[in-house]
């Protein structure tokens, strides 16, 4: 059972209202109206939507998260949408928000933001981020603004002759939009697809007046793999029928409005946002079991057919250029071993970075698992971290010599003769495993753990954390007292100025934030050939080999019995992690440099700290070419 979120009408109306208000606000009206929170027009902002946020997160926390990926001045506004609950069990609460970014942000930073957030897990919630289509800025084809608090439809001015979306046709009488003049290019009326500019010479067909759906008839959602209906176009930023025969990313040819009217079918209003992907990303093991038993895929039982995968890849790549990289991360665990009947290898996707576990002897091919850190190395690397910290004017330290990460699923069994021969070549690093469970300690380096380690080694940073904690607690208590006093003075009047206060967008900033003094970036630097030698008792060694996943390679000199039960020599490519730490204060940077130098991190590895100059791309590329 998939956890497809069913968006309520309240959330959809709130999201449409926020984007519409940001796109249609004029400067002249703002001077006459009452003071309100500043909003931004389409020419100054790029709207993106973030779904599946952890419940309870505030706009300040979301802004801080995005500010760690792009420069924080590129963020204009963050709007938290009302929480939603799934319509099918388990009834899970979903939180979404809309972020307005500066229009001047470069494409590389925007794509990096989308790719990073789409692969980010926040409190065990996998985030989903996508660009929202621009609303129509044409004066003759505007959509009504909707109040944030009451979700009511504002009255449309008579001089603008705005057409009303079919969603609100039952509240306000809709107006048929007038066809634009021949001199006006169609690209001004629809900016969702770049293919519109190629159709300047086509005739424009006006849309017939939409018919509201009866109350007893539930509106139909768009099919999972099918095209959008014509009534979906207002959700995408253009009135239906203004651009006939335009090829949408989800279909080949859009039926004309006249054909729909001839068929006699009413223009039903959709209750869902357009689906971004063909499935909702949940726990991969649950999704695999569902797809394995699903009657929709009798061929493989593990996912969409090859023809469907090819079609989905081409279709979604038109919407988001980074779809291929994102889908490679999400579909990492979708394929199972077709040679083993009933054997479904599962992976841990809840943040636990231990080895892949294959049940009942299922094999794991390297192509399925190596995609993950190859993609992540493209996102998180020394260049990106140093570039961000240099743009923020931070003092930078580089920390190396952490314990490597040993992927257990890639262990290759060796005979003793092969092990000695490879060790004599002096091209391999030798690691001895002398205790049970020691191998599992060679895990991935986590920036949260490293940050706590830095605070413990540098007492001044720990005191700053405690001082900041007490200060924020005092601010929170004073804020709560003032809010209580305000409620008492207003009695039961909830329509006062409190709705326009600065705390309506996500609530007060009461969360503890101890990350402002320094930033930590962890990345995979390189892979290193490593030999493992196990010095364990025979019973523990046999237990380890018995629970070891089926490897993809094995030395020819190792017999089956020895390889299955008593193998004690292995070869593997370990992943070496480095870290970049940035400080706003030079004194804290020097103090951390002295406190961390030659300190043992874990497993006997002593870290080494180096000071880095401001990032220069030419110098950085020259150094990489030398090494």
From Swiss-Prot:
It comes from the Eukaryota. The modification Phosphoserine is found at residue 559. The keyword Phosphoprotein applies. Residues 141-187, 490-510 are annotated as: Disordered. This is Uncharacterized protein YIL055C. Keywords: Phosphoprotein. GO terms for cellular component: mitochondrion. Residues 491-510 have a biased composition (Polar residues).
């Amino acid at each position: 059972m998939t956890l497809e979120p069913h968006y309520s009408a309240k959330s959809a109306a709130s999201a449409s209202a926020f984007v519409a208000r940001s796109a249609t606000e004029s400067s002249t009206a703002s001077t006459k109206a009452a003071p309100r929170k500043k909003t931004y027009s389409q020419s100054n902002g790029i709207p993106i939507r973030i779904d599946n946020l952890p419940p309870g997160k505030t706009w300040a926390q979301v802004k801080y998260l995005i500010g760690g990926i792009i420069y924080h001045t590129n963020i204009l506004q963050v709007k938290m949408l009302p929480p939603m609950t799934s319509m099918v069990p388990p009834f899970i609460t979903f939180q979404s928000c809309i972020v307005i970014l500066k229009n001047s942000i470069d494409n590389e930073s925007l794509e990096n933001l989308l790719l990073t957030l789409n692969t980010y897990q926040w409190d065990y919630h996998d985030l989903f981020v996508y660009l929202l289509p621009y609303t129509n800025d044409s004066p003759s084809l505007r959509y009504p603004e909707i109040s944030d608090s009451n979700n009511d439809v504002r009255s449309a001015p008579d001089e603008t002759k705005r057409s009303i979306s079919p969603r609100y046709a039952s509240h306000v009488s809709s107006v048929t939009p007038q066809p634009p003049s021949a001199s006006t290019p169609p690209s001004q009326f629809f900016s969702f697809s770049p293919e519109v500019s190629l159709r300047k010479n086509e005739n424009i067909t006006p849309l017939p007046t939409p018919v509201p759906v009866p109350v007893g008839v539930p509106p139909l959602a768009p099919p999972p793999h099918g095209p959008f209906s014509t009534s979906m176009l207002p959700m995408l930023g253009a009135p239906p029928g203004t651009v006939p025969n335009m090829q949408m990313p989800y279909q080949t040819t859009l039926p004309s409005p006249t054909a729909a009217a001839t068929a006699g079918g009413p223009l039903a209003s959709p209750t869902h946002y357009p689906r971004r992907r063909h499935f909702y990303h949940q726990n991969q093991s649950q999704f695999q079991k569902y797809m394995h038993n699903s009657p929709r895929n009798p061929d493989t039982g593990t996912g969409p057919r090859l023809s469907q995968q090819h079609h989905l890849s081409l279709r979604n790549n038109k919407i988001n250029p980074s779809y291929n990289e994102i889908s490679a991360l999400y579909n990492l665990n979708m394929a199972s071993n077709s040679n083993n009947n009933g054997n479904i290898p599962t992976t841990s996707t809840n943040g636990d970075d231990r080895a892949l576990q294959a049940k009942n002897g299922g094999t794991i091919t390297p192509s399925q698992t190596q995609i993950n850190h190859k993609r992540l190395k493209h996102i998180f690397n020394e260049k990106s971290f140093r570039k961000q910290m240099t743009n923020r004017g931070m003092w930078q330290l580089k920390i190396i010599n952490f314990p490597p990460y040993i992927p257990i699923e890639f262990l290759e069994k060796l005979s003793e003769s092969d092990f000695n021969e490879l060790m004599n070549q002096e091209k391999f690093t030798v690691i001895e495993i002398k205790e049970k469970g020691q191998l599992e300690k060679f895990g991935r380096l986590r920036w949260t753990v490293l940050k706590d380690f830095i605070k413990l080694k540098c007492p001044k940073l720990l005191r700053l954390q405690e001082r900041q904690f007490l200060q924020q607690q005092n601010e929170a208590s004073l804020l709560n007292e003032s809010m209580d006093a305000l409620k008492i003075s207003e009695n039961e009047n909830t329509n006062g100025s409190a709705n326009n206060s600065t705390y309506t967008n996500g609530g007060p900033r009461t969360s503890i934030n101890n990350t402002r003094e320094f930033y930590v970036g962890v990345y995979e630097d390189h892979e290193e050939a490593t030999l493992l030698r196990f010095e364990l008792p025979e019973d523990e060694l046999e237990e380890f080999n018995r629970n070891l996943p089926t490897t993809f390679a094995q030395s020819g000199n190792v017999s089956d019995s020895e390889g299955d039960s008593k193998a004690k020599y292995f070869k593997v490519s370990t992943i070496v992690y480095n870290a970049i730490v940035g400080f706003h204060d030079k004194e804290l940077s020097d103090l951390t440099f002295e406190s961390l130098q030659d300190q043992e991190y874990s497993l006997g590895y002593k870290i080494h700290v180096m000071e880095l100059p401001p990032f220069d791309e030419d110098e950085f590329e020259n150094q990489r070419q030398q090494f």
